[in-house]
């Protein structure tokens, strides 16, 4: 019998951070923030990025031999939860494995800083420059202006829901938790090994201050 549960995901980032969007924010802005399309201008971490981050983090847990409530995190389990290509790990060609988890976007409050199309926005950007390693001077034409959706140093919480649909008979039996609780615990643990989110991470953007996964509904 199939089960369904909802897990609330929450990631708090420290500004500056950037999930790059395609919109033109304002004249002179080279990298604009990705926002929702519901008319509220909420910054988001897109669902596919959330899935990719958590899948990679779970793989890290598997490689480290982590167990959660007596159940080892394995690539087979990760494949069941996140899906995998048809030709991966001996799978049948042309028959990809669908993932049990459906992720939604993680959304931050709207208009933290307002968007750059609504002035005044004097502090809503951050300027970067590339340095020539041989001369120590700024490279010609290597100035980048990045949109900020929150003041530097401010913590911004992105939250959303992941829906899990699975047959508990396909999951190992945890020692004390239900299968749904185990999946929530896995995602919570995986969030804890993600140091940064978004673009420009090597420049110090997207630091994760805290993150959590909590089961909110099961049926």
Task: Walk through the language-model features, giving the residues of each.
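RNA-binding basic/glycine-rich loop and surface signature characteristic of RAMP-family CRISPR effectors
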Residues: 1-219
């Amino acid at each position: 019998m199939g089960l369904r549960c909802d897990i609330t995901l929450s990631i708090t980032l420290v500004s500056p951070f950037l999930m790059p969007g395609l919109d033109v924010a304002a004249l002179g802005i080279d990298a604009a923030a990705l926002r929702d399309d519901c008319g509220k201008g909420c910054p988001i971490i897109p669902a596919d990025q959330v899935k990719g981050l958590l899948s990679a983090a779970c793989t890290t847990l598997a490689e480290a031999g982590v167990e959660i409530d007596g159940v080892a995190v394995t690539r087979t389990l990760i494949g069941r939860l996140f899906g995998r290509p048809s030709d991966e790990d001996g799978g049948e060609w042309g028959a990809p494995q669908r993932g049990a988890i459906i992720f939604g976007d993680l959304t931050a409050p709207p208009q933290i800083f307002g968007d750059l199309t609504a002035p005044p926005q004097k502090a809503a950007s951050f300027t970067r420059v590339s340095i020539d390693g041989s001369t120590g001077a700024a490279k010609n034409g290597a100035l980048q202006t990045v949109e900020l959706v929150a003041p530097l140093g401010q913590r911004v919480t992105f939250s959303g829901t992941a829906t899990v649909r699975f047959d508990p008979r396909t999951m190992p039996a945890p020692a004390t938790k239900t299968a749904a609780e185990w999946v929530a615990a896995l995602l919570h643990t995986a969030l804890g090994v993600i140091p940064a989110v978004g673009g420009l991470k090597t420049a110090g953007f997207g630091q994760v201050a805290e993150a959590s996964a909590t089961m909110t509904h099961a049926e």
